[in-house]
């Protein structure tokens, strides 16, 4: 939208904004925005509290305080009179008082007409001074042939009137062009200039005499004490020089304005490009010239500023302010406090200072005061305006309050967490929301949450009021509101009625990933706490120790449908991070299921036969058979589906029969904890538990091995298989087509119609889905039939109304999609029930001591005594003794752990052991502390970067371990020793959480605009994947199976016999992946995000499977944000401690953890420890020689690599290695570019310089995966690929060819390819550039959207560069659309697929006549 056409910004509809541009405001622009000049520093009258006329809150300028009230005469008008002029009095007509809403005070601006030009603070202080870069002032000092560049500081001194500049030499040799005249050398420079000028005039002339007098006075002043201390009078001497010659010397903003007026931008550009070409040649000749590299970078930056002004066509003089805008009054409010005190925004004080100084300058000028006084006043005015623009960045003279607090300027209102971008534009406060403490709601269904009645009454107040009035319970809104406030019992039935089909959204801070916000169906509870389903706590990372949650209410019908379809907890079963269920039972539920599935040999009732399941339950209730006894039931009682093919009886425990009874009839029977791939292993597994007729049950059972009960891991595997079996396969549209064909006469045969449907894989529906769908359909139709019959007889062939069909569709669709959750709810109920029945309790007597503990402790003490003896004799150093002692105590603790493990192995009745083995709570490490020894404790010594670089031993572990266990009790020393570690754990966690949150924020900014936008980009450029192997330990980090599952193949896959296993362009499912791996294939070429051709986005085939839905990703999915959340969310689990156990803090120890992750993602050039040396060539290691032979002081090695040059000649390259670095190669080894020669982290820039982008991508992927996998966290490759793609998305231009790029500019890789493609097609010279790697901190700052970049970091720098280049934001990303109030271009606002897993269309739309 062209903002030049309309200045009525307040009336622009946010939906009509298509793009936003920034430019330098001209003085005319400011006058056009303004509704009057502010010329008085007063705000409000201290008696009347009314705004002062012409002051900072003037109602005529900024709008009325009361709606539609004349600011002059006080007469009130109606809304219909808005924008009219008041003509009630003569004064009203003279002043042009306009009738406005008080909202005008939020957008009406004023201005201050400055009495001196003022340079905008941002343009000489931000990013090493834009003014300095643009002018590029140089001066030839003396006889020097090389010019000296005038520094940023010198220009700042000039702006603040501390020094003067020679603007015109007037032919005087003593004055060099652009020479900055500093106070220390002013006397000599002026003296030489005057001596040179005097020669122009004959002796005895008036001019000669005047100049001679001036020279004499100057000599007296410079030799006097005052002259030496305070310098000379610049202004008088400048006037003399200007009067008697054509030279000109000036200072302040006027001098800068003169220089900006004279600059020839195109000539400057040509000069810079020529200089750049010369520097570039020197660098190519000698790549080690660091100073030349720095010079080149400075020239790049200068060229960028010059180009910005040329391309935008703006006048650089517009960086000088003549009319200062005054922001609307309500954006810098003055608030009345108790009594007659007022609190005001800091901006008002800053504006006040400007107005006072501006008025004073005006008076001095009118009084023709001496130049020095006027210049001083101009300097003070410059400082006052600077303080208003950016008070924080002022190095000196910050404007402060009485208490010494710097005042908040306009820049502070924009930047930081509390600034306009992040506080008000990206994050807003929400109406219809509340918060309360959460408690467990074990009786809730998965899609439900308990909402306190009081909260519901307030949140749904408008709907309740409407209901009360409609049902004539009250006569007015006021009465209804009073009734709700008083909690009148009449309202509760209406509250219950109103909340039907109105979902609520729950959010728990910190919102680390999308599962921290989920939706539920509200269930009213009488308490004051929100009740939460126990299975969804994992997604929220919530517990019930006082956590609070926020509640939000979606209001519009579209928002409600979106919430129900996309955000309901029963739709968020899988975690997006790894595609595994996140709703697995834990704690009490696991303990209950563990207890339920236990088997006991010889238990009461073992071998009993029951004819029915109910008879077995009755016997259990009468206690004639135990829960853990193995009994026999007829096959058809348990699995009627399979009974048709298998006959006989089934053996299991009473508990396992109860457990299996909650699963659908066609789900495999669970006999033991071997639950991997139940469907595949079922036939072989079932044989030993099925007995033919006539078998002696008791005898057979006695010989049968007792099975292990189900632990947490086994239950998680069962949940996964339940999801795979019963997760929805159809689209809503498919079920609608069946409902459309049914009536009350044929609904019983709906299964025939369902059999014709095909799932999203184009396959027939499996039997479990057919049976469940027909069951739901028959039930809902019969219910509707009964309901209609209450109003009279219903014909069987009656055609259903559209709204009836829509209602049926909603109910069947909900039940169909809720199949998995209904089973999970049954598992949850069973777990809680049997954990209660188990009566599990613990006592101190349950803790059994480690049998051989004291033997191990004795062994350790003897070893330590030996070490001390060796140290005393000087055989080992103190550091070596410390390292060996730590290693020994670590081994002793491991031995005690193993001993304890053996002693509790068969103790299945011990409650503590049950909790540990089931995975409900605690692990062997906790048990060792209770019953073995506490072990080594952390010290408060921190490993520093310098320790890692110098391989120092860091004593971060207390050498003397805590030998006692909690059962024995700690000694006073041991207790004191363990306090360090306990506190360190808590502080680390707190720091970790903050750093992890910051990492997530940066990653979101990096990848926020990556959305799935197309079906296929038709890229034929693949990505070869294989097992990610840690070359140091030779262990697999990520297996090939995980890397190819859910991805599209780029090439056909054949086995060793040439048989095709999978075709190119197909998505690899789990079975195909297993087949490929089983065939022994080591490498597979897949489609990858790293090779997707879509600009700033990705296509479905390059992305593959959406892990959260377990099917192909939908168009509109914001995969960039999901990737950022998936990498950032587990960040808190990554330990920030280095992994060394008190030994040498070397590189190997610091390979994992949060620190290394940040190094990789931010592309650090100085990582922890000594960086690895890498091979720059393809070659062979021919020699590894010892450096000590040549120079004893420098110990180390020289590695000689023999390689072939481009001319195929043999050459040698020698690399120096320090002695402390561990070699990874030997003589005769072949090396490739980028290969590590020694241990240590690789610097990403170095790797990119010697190899290619693909090598760097593989290295980053491997390293990031290794960090997470070491902590047991699995993250999908595709998320890391998205971040890597963004890190390598920029190209630096080295030759611009015929393109519009300029040398040194950093451009997006897709723009670079697009421009080059066009140039090549037109037979023109393409541009050449190098791919550069940028860290996550810098990528958002290089965004094409200045709104997205400015809302991230360095706001003022981004805005300055956007302004000088008149940048246009096309609002393509997510952040910028949120800022302007648009819907984001993703999800349901993009080209959303109708036949996806979730459908947000109105159910009526499927049955509308015009839709058929």
Curated annotation (Swiss-Prot):
Q: Which organism is it from?
A: Mesomycoplasma hyopneumoniae (strain 7448)
What SMART domains would the database entry show? Answer: RPOLA_N
State the similarity comment.
Belongs to the RNA polymerase beta' chain family.
Which residue ranges does UniProt annotate as crossing the membrane?
none
The terms describing its cellular component in GO are:
DNA-directed RNA polymerase complex
Kindly list the cofactors needed: Mg(2+); Zn(2+)
Q: What biological-process terms (Gene Ontology) are attached?
A: DNA-templated transcription
What is the cofactor note? Answer: Binds 1 Mg(2+) ion per subunit. Binds 1 Zn(2+) ion per subunit; 2 are expected compared to other organisms.
* Entry binding sites for Zn(2+): 1017, 1092, 1099, 1102
Gene transcribed to yield this protein: rpoC
The job of this chain, per UniProt, is described as:
DNA-dependent RNA polymerase catalyzes the transcription of DNA into RNA using the four ribonucleoside triphosphates as substrates.
Protein name per its UniProtKB record? DNA-directed RNA polymerase subunit beta'
PANTHER family the record matches: DNA-DIRECTED RNA POLYMERASE, DNA-DIRECTED RNA POLYMERASE SUBUNIT BETA
* Matching SUPFAM superfamilies: beta and beta-prime subunits of DNA dependent RNA-polymerase
- Give the keywords, sorted: DNA-directed RNA polymerase, Magnesium, Metal-binding, Nucleotidyltransferase, Transcription, Transferase, Zinc
């Amino acid at each position: 939208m062209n903002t030049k056409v309309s200045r009525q910004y307040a009336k622009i509809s946010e939906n009509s904004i298509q793009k936003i541009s920034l430019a330098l405001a001209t003085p005319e622009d400011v006058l056009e925005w303004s509704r009057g000049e502010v010329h008085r520093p007063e705000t409000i009258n201290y008696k009347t509290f009314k705004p002062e006329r012409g002051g900072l809150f003037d109602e005529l300028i900024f709008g009325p305080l009361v709606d539609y009230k004349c600011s002059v005469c006080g007469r009130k008008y109606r809304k219909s009179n808005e924008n009219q002029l008041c003509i009630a009095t003569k004064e009203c007509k003279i002043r042009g008082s306009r009738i406005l809403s008080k909202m005008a005070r939020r957008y009406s601006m004023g201005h201050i007409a400055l009495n001196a030009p003022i340079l905008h603070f941002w343009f000489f202080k931000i990013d090493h001074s834009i003014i300095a870069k643009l002018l590029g002032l140089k001066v030839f000092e003396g006889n020097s042939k090389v010019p000296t560049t005038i520094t940023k500081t010198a220009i700042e001194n000039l702006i603040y009137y501390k020094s003067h500049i020679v603007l015109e030499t007037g032919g005087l040799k003593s004055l060099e062009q652009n020479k900055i005249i500093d106070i220390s050398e002013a006397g000599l420079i002026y003296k030489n200039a005057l001596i040179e000028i005097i020669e122009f005039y004959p002796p005895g002339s008036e001019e000669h005499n005047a100049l001679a007098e001036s020279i004499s006075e100057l000599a007296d002043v410079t030799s006097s004490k005052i002259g030496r201390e305070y310098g000379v009078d610049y202004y008088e001497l400048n006037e003399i020089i200007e009067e008697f010659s054509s030279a000109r010397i000036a200072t302040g903003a006027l001098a800068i304005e003169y220089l900006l007026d004279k600059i020839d931008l195109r000539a400057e550009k040509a000069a810079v490009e020529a200089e750049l070409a010369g520097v570039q040649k020197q660098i190519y000749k000698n790549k080690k010239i660091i100073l030349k590299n720095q010079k080149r970078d400075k020239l790049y930056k200068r060229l960028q500023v010059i180009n910005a002004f040329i391309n935008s066509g703006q006048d650089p003089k517009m960086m000088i302010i003549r009319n200062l805008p005054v922001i609307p009054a309500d954006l810098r409010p003055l608030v009345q406090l108790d009594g007659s005190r007022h609190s005001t925004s800091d901006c008002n004080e800053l504006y006040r200072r400007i107005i006072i100084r501006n008025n004073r300058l005006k008076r001095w000028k009118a009084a023709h005061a001496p130049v020095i006084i006027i210049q001083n006043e101009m300097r003070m005015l410059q400082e006052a305006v600077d303080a208003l623009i950016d008070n924080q960045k002022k190095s000196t003279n910050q404007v402060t309050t009485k208490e010494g607090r710097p005042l908040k300027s306009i820049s502070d209102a924009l930047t930081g967490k509390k600034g306009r971008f992040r506080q008000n534009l990206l994050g807003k406060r929400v109406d219809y929301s509340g918060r309360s403490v959460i408690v467990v709601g074990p009786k809730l269904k998965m899609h439900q949450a308990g909402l306190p009645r009081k909260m519901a009454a307030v949140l749904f107040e408008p709907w309740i009021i409407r209901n009360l009035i409609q049902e004539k319970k009250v006569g007015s809104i006021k009465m209804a509101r009073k009734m709700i406030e008083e909690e009148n019992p009449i309202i509760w039935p209406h509250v219950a009625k109103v909340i039907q089909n109105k979902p609520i959204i729950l959010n728990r801070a910190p919102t680390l990933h999308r599962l921290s916000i989920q939706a539920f169906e509200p269930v009213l509870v009488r308490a004051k706490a929100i009740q939460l389903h126990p299975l969804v706590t994992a997604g929220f990372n919530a517990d019930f120790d006082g956590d609070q949650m926020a509640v939000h209410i979606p209001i519009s019908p579209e928002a409600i449908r979106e919430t129900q379809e996309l955000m309901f907890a029963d739709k968020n079963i899988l975690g997006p991070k790894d595609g595994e269920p996140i709703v697995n039972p834990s704690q009490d539920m696991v303990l209950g299921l563990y207890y339920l599935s236990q088997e006991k040999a010889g238990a009461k009732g073992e071998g009993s036969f029951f004819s029915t399941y109910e008879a077995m339950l009755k016997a259990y209730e009468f206690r004639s058979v135990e829960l853990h006894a193995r009994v026999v039931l007829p096959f058809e009682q348990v699995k009627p589906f399979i009974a048709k093919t298998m006959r006989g009886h089934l053996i299991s425990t009473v508990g396992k029969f109860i457990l299996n009874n909650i699963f659908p009839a066609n789900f495999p029977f669970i006999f033991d904890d071997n639950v991997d791939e139940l469907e595949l292993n079922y036939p072989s597994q079932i044989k030993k538990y099925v007995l033919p007729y006539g078998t002696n049950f008791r005898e057979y059972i006695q010989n049968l091995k007792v099975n292990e009960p189900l632990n947490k891991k086994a239950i998680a595997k069962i949940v996964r298989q339940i999801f795979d079996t019963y997760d929805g396969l159809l689209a809503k549209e498919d079920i609608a087509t069946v409902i459309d064909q049914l009536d009350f006469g044929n609904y019983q045969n709906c299964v025939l119609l369902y059999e014709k449907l095909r799932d999203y894989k184009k396959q027939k529906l499996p039997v479990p889905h057919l049976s469940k769908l027909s069951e739901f359909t028959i039930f809902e139709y019969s219910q509707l039939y009964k309901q209609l019959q209450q109003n009279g007889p219903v014909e069987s062939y009656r055609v259903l109304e559209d709204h009836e069909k829509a209602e049926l569709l909603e109910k069947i669709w909900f039940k169909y999609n809720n199949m998995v959750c209904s089973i999970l709810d049954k598992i949850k109920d069973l777990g809680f029930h049997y954990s209660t029945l188990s009566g599990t309790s613990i006592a101190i007597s349950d803790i059994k001591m480690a049998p051989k503990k004291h033997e191990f402790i004795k062994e350790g003490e003897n070893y330590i005594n030996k070490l001390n003896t060796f140290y005393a004799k000087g055989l080992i150093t103190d550091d070596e003794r410390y390292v060996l002692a730590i290693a020994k105590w670590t081994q002793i603790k491991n031995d005690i752990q193993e001993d304890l493990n053996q002693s509790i192995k068969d103790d299945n009745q011990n409650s503590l052991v049950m909790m540990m083995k089931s995975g409900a709570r605690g692990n062997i490490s906790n048990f060792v502390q209770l019953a073995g020894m506490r072990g080594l404790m952390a010290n408060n010594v921190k490993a520093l970067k310098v320790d890692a670089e110098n391989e120092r031993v860091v004593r971060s572990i207390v050498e003397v371990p805590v030998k006692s266990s909690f059962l024995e009790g700690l000694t006073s020393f041991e207790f004191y020793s363990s306090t360090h570690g306990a506190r360190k754990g808590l502080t680390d966690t707190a720091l970790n959480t903050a750093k992890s949150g910051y990492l997530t924020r940066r990653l979101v900014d990096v990848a926020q605009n990556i959305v799935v936008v197309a079906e296929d980009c038709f890229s034929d450029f693949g990505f070869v994947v294989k097992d990610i192997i840690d070359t140091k330990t030779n262990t697999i980090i990520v297996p090939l199976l995980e890397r190819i599952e859910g991805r599209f193949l780029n090439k056909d896959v054949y086995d060793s016999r040439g048989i095709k296993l999978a075709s190119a362009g197909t998505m690899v499912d789990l079975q195909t992946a297993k087949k490929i791996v089983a065939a022994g294939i080591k490498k597979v070429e897949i489609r990858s995000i790293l090779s997707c051709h879509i600009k700033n986005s990705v296509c479905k085939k390059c992305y593959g499977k959406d892990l959260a839905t377990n099917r192909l990703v939908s168009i509109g999915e914001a995969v960039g944000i999901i990737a950022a959340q998936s990498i950032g969310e587990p960040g808190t689990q990554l330990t920030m401690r280095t992994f060394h156990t008190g030994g040498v803090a070397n590189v190997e120890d610091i390979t994992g953890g949060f620190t290394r992750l940040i190094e990789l993602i931010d592309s650090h050039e100085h990582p922890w420890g000594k960086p690895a040396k890498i091979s720059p060539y393809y070659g062979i290691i021919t020699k590894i020689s010892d450096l000590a032979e040549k120079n004893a002081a420098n110990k180390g090695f020289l590695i000689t690599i023999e390689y072939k040059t481009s001319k195929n000649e043999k050459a040698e390259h020698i690399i120096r290695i320090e002695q402390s670095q561990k070699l990874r190669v030997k003589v005769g080894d072949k090396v490739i570019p980028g290969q590590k020669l020694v241990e240590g982290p690789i610097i990403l820039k170095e790797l990119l310089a010697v190899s290619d982008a693909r090598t760097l991508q593989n290295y980053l992927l491997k390293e990031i995966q290794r960090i997470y996998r070491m902590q047991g966290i699995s993250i999908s490759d595709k998320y890391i690929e998205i971040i890597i793609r963004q890190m390598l998305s920029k190209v630096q231009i080295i030759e611009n060819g015929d393109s519009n790029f300029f040398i040194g500019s950093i451009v997006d890789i897709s723009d670079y390819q697009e421009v080059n493609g066009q140039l090549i097609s037109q037979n023109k010279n393409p541009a050449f550039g190098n791919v550069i790697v940028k860290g996550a901190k810098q990528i958002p700052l290089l965004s094409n959207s200045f709104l997205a970049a400015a809302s991230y970091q360095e706001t003022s720098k981004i805005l300055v560069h956007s302004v000088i280049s008149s940048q246009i934001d096309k609002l393509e990303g997510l952040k910028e659309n949120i800022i302007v109030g648009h819907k984001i271009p993703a999800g349901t606002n993009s080209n959303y697929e109708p036949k996806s897993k979730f459908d947000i269309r109105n159910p009526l739309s499927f049955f509308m006549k015009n839709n058929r």
